């Protein structure tokens, strides 16, 4: 499950795992995401609450009601079939995270992103 956080200016939050965590998309910019075996909304909500500290001036615990499911997509990498379950999360402002970027959703082409991230961005843009 992936969260497309979107502020009123059309900006979104992009993060990357420089140390190889999340090896499939290591070192590429991506939306905050987590593997969800059961309830993707709850799993993603818990993941966001874990990676975004309250000290970032943002309270992830209030997100559950604001998570709008987007069109699911499929992505294949080597021998893995991945089902992408994105959620659009409208926020008054994006959290401040060290090392993160906040580009406009409409202008992600200048970042190194995977085709899976591109599919998620396309689903979000289509829903707007």
Description of each model-found segment:
Residues 1-128:
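Intrinsically disordered, low-complexity, charged terminal extensions of DNA damage-control enzymes
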